[in-house]
Amino acid sequence: MAIHKIRAFFNLEASGGIVLALAAIAAMIIANTSLNTWYESFIHAPVAIQIGSFSIAKDAHHWINDGLMAVFFFLVGLELKREVLIGELSNVKQIILPAGAALGGMVMPAIVYLFFNYNEPEFWRGWAIPTATDIAFALGILSLLGNRVPNSLKVFLVSIAIFDDIGAIIIIALFYTNDLSLGSLAIAGLCLPFLYMLNRRNVTSITPYLLIGVIMWIAVLKSGIHATLAGVVLALFIPLFDRTDPEHSPLEELEHDLQNTVSYGILPLFAFANAGISLKGAGFGELFHSVPLGIAAGLFIGKQVGVMLMCWLIFKLGISTMPKGMNFKQIYGAALLCGVGFTMSLFIGGLAFAGETPLFDERLGIIMGSIVSGIAGYMMLKTTLKDEVNVTSVDLTRHS
């Protein structure tokens, strides 16, 4: 029966990654065919919310990236908080490892990019493009491996990506934002003591947290900083335990409620809205311009070298230890996946070279570096992870 096949597919651990990949492939095909006009109309369709004199007007693309993706980052923040309190990151030393790896994974790509452009000072402002990691696509690729992935590896990659995104947001605020609104940031900051008070008073109803979270999200959005940061911050205040009922965990209930919505709704929509890059008019020869070449090399070479070098140094100095159930080959696979810069790199590239005469196309370097990193990371992990339960090979025909 068809319904059984569909149910069996969605029971696969890898199904979320498969749906994400299909959405990205569909977008790339559509954007480079005659359907591109429809695609552009869809992602740039104006959507506005107005209450009295207050209004937020964005196109669909921005609502997906700034709004829906804040929900994804909220879920990631919930998972991260749980791991810090009772999971893989409950030891402070284990937090140092992904934080250091993220730092190395940002510094080295910038160095590689500047090496390729050391004779071109006018292109130095693109140094931050290869420092980014697209957490959604990196985790999507990881999920293709199903439940062979140890939880420690997923937490390690998520932690690196979170620190990386925070670093990217700081870089954007310091180097690429001309109209930062301190007033809006102050409003966002004022939300924090209220969230803290709710947590300390053991308020387990999610509604007041979400109401304050929406206010904080709007303030961060208006400030000029990437609004998804509000999702991570809000997650930190959701109580893990109900002090009056130890069996009740508001945080874990939220995780469970959001998982399918994010995996099969938000992330595929995000992939579809961001992967549709039209390459019409872009020559392959442009890839060898110092800017796209430096970006591609920064993502593929710089990321893996930076992450691995910092991990090796941290282990060598005894600052932290190898996460349980992991080895250097798996860390290397995760380091490769960190080179999937994609959407955040595209965003920074648009800021760095806004209004630039098209002597080159930085998107080519981002796409090439991200694709090569993603494929290499997937292949590396596929060959190193133990196939304890090969969920990708479930026989979908057995229910027919």
Curated annotation (Swiss-Prot):
Gene Ontology cellular component list: plasma membrane
Main location: membrane
Keyword rRNA-binding attached: no
InterPro entries linked to this entry: Na/H_antiporter_dom_sf (IPR023171), NhaA (IPR004670)
Record's subcellular location: Cell inner membrane
Gene Ontology process terms (BP): regulation of pH
Membrane topology per record: Multi-pass membrane protein
Chain ranges passing through the membrane: 10-30, 60-80, 95-115, 126-146, 155-175, 178-198, 218-238, 265-285, 295-315, 334-354, 364-384
Keyword Transmembrane helix carried by entry: yes
An MF annotation (GO) of this entry: sodium:proton antiporter activity
Alphabetic keyword roster: Antiport, Cell inner membrane, Cell membrane, Ion transport, Membrane, Sodium, Sodium transport, Transmembrane, Transmembrane helix, Transport
Known catalytic reactions: Na(+)(in) + 2 H(+)(out) = Na(+)(out) + 2 H(+)(in)
Function text: Na(+)/H(+) antiporter that extrudes sodium in exchange for external protons.
Family: Belongs to the NhaA Na(+)/H(+) (TC 2.A.33) antiporter family.
Protein name (record): Na(+)/H(+) antiporter NhaA
Source organism per UniProt: Psychrobacter arcticus (strain DSM 17307 / VKM B-2377 / 273-4)
